[in-house]
UniProtKB/Swiss-Prot annotation:
The keyword NAD does not apply. One of its GO terms (molecular function) is growth factor activity. The lineage of its organism: Eukaryota, Metazoa, Chordata, Craniata, Vertebrata. The keyword Signal applies. Gene3D superfamilies: 1.20.1250.10. This is Interleukin-4. One of its GO terms (biological process) is dendritic cell differentiation. Cytokine secreted primarily by mast cells, T-cells, eosinophils, and basophils that plays a role in regulating antibody production, hematopoiesis and inflammation, and the development of effector T-cell responses. Induces the expression of class II MHC molecules on resting B-cells. Enhances both secretion and cell surface expression of IgE and IgG1. Also regulates the expression of the low affinity Fc receptor for IgE (CD23) on both lymphocytes and monocytes. Positively regulates IL31RA expression in macrophages. InterPro entries: 4_helix_cytokine-like_core, IL-4, IL-4/IL-13, IL-4/IL-13_CS. Glycans are attached at residue 62. It is linked to Ischemic stroke: A stroke is an acute neurologic event leading to death of neural tissue of the brain and resulting in loss of motor, sensory and/or cognitive function. Ischemic strokes, resulting from vascular occlusion, is considered to be a highly complex disease consisting of a group of heterogeneous disorders with multiple genetic and environmental risk factors. Interacts with IL4R. Interacts with IL13RA1.
Amino acid sequence: MGLTSQLLPPLFFLLACAGNFVHGHKCDITLQEIIKTLNSLTEQKTLCTELTVTDIFAASKNTTEKETFCRAATVLRQFYSHHEKDTRCLGATAQQFHRHKQLIRFLKRLDRNLWGLAGLNSCPVKEANQSTLENFLERLKTIMREKYSKCSS
């Protein structure tokens, strides 16, 4: 029994340290993947990037970081669900079609990663202001880069 009580404090310490290491490491990996995906998305010019989405960043003063990530994921999900088979986005050429499919795949990946960071089940999105998908992604990229710089320091 004496041995068990002596081992408990070091075991709790190791458990706490391992949890912090894993959390910080996950933060870096997830943010790196999000930023990489956003870089790819913002470099692409497709027929759909000029379409409008709800601008969740317009009035985000009283919004937590998790709510922002959740709302961004919701907006992306609404967009790719609605425009995945949109003939305006598919284009007339094989190259336009391929770019659109790649855009949708990247948006789905981004959605999944944002939901993981948010850790919320659902969040409301008010459709007051609009911006283009391109501008939305640029603003999200800026936010993610800021978060990454804080996370890695």
